[in-house]
């Protein structure tokens, strides 16, 4: 019996009359490009934020596509508020743009699955930072907060300038510097983060994510920022 794999669709477009070309996120294979055969009854099933399960036949050549068959519906996460949907759209766009193809991503997949199940209006900012930090780890760009770029230990009572490759001790009291105590919270549970910690860590992940994006623009981030500005 063929094994079935859980997956989420990140992006899809029509490919010929009865097929979709999809980018999917899986635990076992990371991100994959694949073909899915469709009919009138199943077209609406293949959407982002829907957990699916199916048989995956991996592409045999680098220039060919994987195929997904015998697809089952598992669970939908569309019953969320608008801010949560924008947040999840942002996460999907990050995975779609940044994650490499065909690489096992069990930790990141489990974080993604956890966020889909648990995100709400009270915690979405925390969970977005959690995912950004895990994604950076998966990309080999994990944030190291034990020492600064000069090799000196991060001090709770000192301020630091954020750089894409680390942190530099700030002796000029710059407005955009952040405290060492907040930096160290990156390695601690979300429950230990204060509002000030969250703001500081958000600035750190913004710099690091922008660095790996290398100029790519996130449509979902703009939608999220515009929506939050309207609510002020």
From Swiss-Prot:
Any single biological process term in GO: double-strand break repair
GO cellular component terms attached to this protein's record: bacterial nucleoid
Gene3D superfamilies in UniProt: Nucleic acid-binding proteins, Recombination protein O, C-terminal domain
Pfam families: RecO_C, RecO_N
Keywords: DNA damage, DNA recombination, DNA repair
Sequence similarity: Belongs to the RecO family.
Function of the molecule: Involved in DNA repair and RecF pathway recombination.
Protein name listed in UniProt: DNA repair protein RecO
Organism from which the protein derives: Francisella tularensis subsp. novicida (strain U112)
Name of encoding gene: recO
């Amino acid at each position: 019996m063929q094994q079935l794999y859980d997956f989420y669709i990140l992006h899809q477009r029509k490919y010929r009359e009865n097929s979709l070309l999809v980018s999917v996120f899986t635990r076992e294979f990371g991100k994959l490009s694949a073909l899915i055969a469709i009919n009138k009854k199943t077209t609406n099933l293949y959407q982002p934020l829907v957990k699916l399960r199916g048989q995956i036949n991996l592409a045999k050549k680098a220039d060919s596509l994987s195929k997904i068959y015998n697809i089952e519906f598992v669970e939908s996460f569309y019953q969320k508020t608008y801010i949560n949907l924008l947040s999840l759209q942002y996460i999907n766009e990050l995975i779609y743009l940044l994650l490499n193809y065909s690489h096992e991503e069990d930790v990141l997949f489990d974080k993604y699955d956890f966020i889909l199940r648990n995100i709400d209006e009270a915690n979405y900012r925390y969970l977005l930072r959690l995912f950004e930090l895990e994604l950076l780890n998966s990309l080999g760009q994990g944030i190291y907060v034990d020492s600064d770029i000069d090799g000196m230990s991060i001090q709770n009572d000192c301020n630091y300038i954020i750089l894409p490759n680390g942190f530099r001790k700030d002796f000029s009291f710059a407005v955009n510097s952040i405290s060492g105590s907040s930096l160290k919270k990156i390695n601690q549970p979300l429950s230990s983060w204060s509002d000030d910690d969250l703001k500081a860590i958000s600035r750190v992940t913004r710099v690091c994510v922008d660095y790996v994006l290398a100029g790519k623009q996130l449509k979902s981030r703009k939608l999220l920022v515009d929506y939050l500005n309207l609510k002020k």
